[in-house]
Regions:
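Beta-propeller blade termini and top-face loops
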Residues: 1-628
Length: 628
């Protein structure tokens, strides 16, 4: 394999750590790209976690008493729809050159690791636990023997995990922890509950008490913690309150009483995606809250503003400081790593970390070398050549950013490499003319009096193999265009279950409307997720949905035949139809890849039909769990 993607985009960073004894050595973790290490302040990098079984990372920590000891918690701690999951915690004793799995395999999402300042064998791990299902391993875990054994010291609820912990630098027996109750389903997201809150231990985590004086009694959401390095009696908490509102709370008496300083809270797609809180080691009272734009306060959160971020990617998740430079910040975003030497007035982008998260890719048929296209998480849609006959090879300048926002599915027109289709989230379909540079919005719109179109977060695009200008697109119904998207005709009714998603169970039961729903963090539900057409028979169409349905039409959409995936032996009724493909050689054969991990089921579901969907068989064979 050779890497072929762009050099102008990186990807989502989950954590950053600077070596305490050598500030040229950094460790960077990615939401979907493993762990990377540099020994020259970002000039070059090497991946140090690629041989392990998880690519999604939540947190990294170095032992203060022996920085060669490195701990990595897998599965990033955000509540988003596109979050990767992990398989526990890992330890290295040689600076990341080799790793050993140390347990917590069913944690899925690890948020914070704290190592005792004087004893590398004592470690506390904040485990948020599964996002999509109950149970698993969640809570605060402690080891006193370097990870050989773990003791759960906080948390006993099937939906409540621990999202952050901080330690008093004067007394390692004093710890503060934030619990978080959350659950996401394919249909909805609830980002808070009565299990969320603040807790304190004065005996190294063996016993805990809830901190409630001054904290609102409503259903809290995600909480970020920080402790003042200059005066550790001062503890800060960025708290998500009802319906994604929030506030910055401060205690000046070691957590006994709390005062709301302001309404400071992260926003954008929702606090579930940010809320990491940092206290400056250089300026007393200065705190940073990760957000779409980094929020900074110089008076303990009473007043605040956005850090200057000109020529820098938004969506900030991680921050690191140098011990001897108060104006230096190293920050991780959805677009990679940046550093500033003047507190945000100017930024340097480290463009050499290949971490871009591609949703889907496509190729055209241009000669002599075809081009590649890919839609990415928060880095737009990219175009670049597969090869070149130039002596200098493929350059960064050969890659183009052809569409904005989150890029998703892409498609090309056979025989005409100038026409490309791309989309932004939830069906923002565009046609790109590579020759003229024109970008045209062509999303199908409902007719007057019709309800809105429910487009999936990653809606499917299909160019017909029988007519290059014919385009299919899907919301909850299938649309067809004969003129590259200039006009559209619906060729189906609603092919999904069309449910009222707020009435569906979440956290194990039906919830009232006044609970901690985060509507803005929910994707559309009851949507079409995949489209296919037989290359051997025009109008033989296949549709898959996010609610466990396959639909087949043999007459170009005039009639549809419904298959419940739960009727297929060995397939759960809830399975998400992620991709459906008609066979290239046999007109009667079709394949589908299904996913049920959003119900806590990591089994592979690959199915095949040899009679146009009338009957199916499971063909997953010995494919391993967590891979399809």
């Amino acid at each position: 394999w050779r890497g072929v993607s762009t050099g102008f985009a990186s990807g989502r960073i989950s954590d950053i750590t600077i070596h305490p004894e050598n500030e040229h050595v950094w460790f960077v973790t990615a939401g979907s790209g493993g762990v990377w290490k540099t020994e020259n302040a970002g000039v070059t990098w090497r991946p140090i976690f690629d041989n392990q079984s998880s690519y999604s990372i939540g947190n990294i920590a170095l032992a203060p008493s022996n920085p060669s000891v490195v701990w990595v918690g897998t599965g990033e701690d955000v509540g988003g729809r596109h979050v990767g999951f992990g398989d526990g915690i890992y330890k290295s004793t040689d600076g990341g050159d080799s790793w050993k799995h140390m347990g917590l395999k069913n944690s899925e999402h690890i948020s914070t690791i704290i190592i005792h300042p004087d004893n590398e064998n004592i470690v506390w791990v904040a485990v948020q636990g599964p996002l999509w299902s109950k149970g698993g391993e969640r809570g605060l875990y402690k080891t006193t023997d370097g990870g050989e054994n773990w003791n759960k010291v906080l948390g006993d609820d099937e939906w409540v995990g621990v999202t952050d912990i901080v330690i008093d630098p004067r007394n390692p027996d004093v710890l503060y922890a934030a619990t978080w109750q959350r659950h996401r389903t394919v249909a909805a997201y609830m980002g808070g509950g009565p299990g969320s809150g603040l807790h304190k231990s004065t005996d190294g985590g063996e016993n805990w008490k809830a901190l409630k004086n001054g904290i609102p009694s409503s259903n809290l959401g995600k909480i970020g913690l920080a402790i003042s390095p200059q005066n550790p009696d001062i503890v800060y908490a960025a708290i998500e309150l009802d319906r994604t509102k929030g506030g910055l709370f401060m205690s000046d008496d070691q957590g006994e009483r709390w005062t709301k300083m302001s309404d400071m809270v992260s926003g954008g797609t929702g606090p579930h995606y940010y809320q990491e809180l940092y206290a400056s080691p250089h300026h007393f009272g200065r705190i940073y809250l990760m957000n779409v734009r980094t929020i900074v306060s110089d008076d303990h959160g009473k007043t605040y503003s956005n850090l200057p971020e000109r020529n820098k990617h938004s969506d900030n998740h991680a921050l690191a400081f140098r011990s001897n430079d108060p104006d230096y910040l190293l920050i991780g975003t959805d677009g990679g790593v940046y550093e500033t030497f003047d507190h945000g007035n100017n930024w340097r982008y480290l463009d050499n970390l290949p971490l871009t998260q591609y949703y889907k890719i496509a190729v055209d048929d241009e000669l002599p070398f075809y081009n590649l296209y890919g839609g990415t998480q928060d880095n737009g849609t990219h175009e670049g050549p597969s090869a070149t006959d130039l002596s200098e090879g493929i350059r960064n300048a050969d890659w183009k950013h052809i569409l904005f926002a989150d890029g998703h599915d892409t498609a090309t027109e056979p025989g005409n490499a100038n026409i490309v289709y791309g989309e932004t989230q939830e069906g923002g379909l565009h046609r790109i003319d590579r020759k003229t540079g024109t970008v045209t919005f062509i999303q199908p719109q409902p007719l007057e009096g019709e309800d809105y179109e429910r487009y999936n977060w990653d809606a499917p695009i299909l160019v017909s193999p029988h007519k290059p200008t014919r385009l299919y697109f899907a919301s909850h119904r299938v649309w067809k265009s004969e003129d590259r998207g200039d006009s559209w005709t619906p060729i189906s009714g609603d092919l999904t279950r069309d449910q009222e998603r707020i009435s569906l169970p979440i956290m194990g039961r039906t919830q009232s409307w006044d609970n901690a729903w985060d509507v803005n963090a929910m994707s559309n539900y009851n949507t079409i997720t995949s489209l296919g057409e037989s290359p051997l028979q025009e109008g033989l169409l296949y549709v898959g949905t996010d609610d466990g349905i396959i639909q087949v039409s043999e007459d170009g959409g005039a009639n549809w035949r419904k298959i419940e995936v739960g009727s297929i032996k060995g397939v759960p009724a809830t399975a998400f139809v992620n991709d459906i493909r008609a066979d290239l050689h046999d007109v009667n054969t079709v394949y589908a890849a299904l996913d049920n991990h959003k119900y806590g089921d990591f089994s592979p579901y690959l199915i095949k039909s040899s009679n146009r969907g009338k009957s199916w068989q499971l063909i997953s064979g010995d494919l391993p769990e967590r891979h399809l």
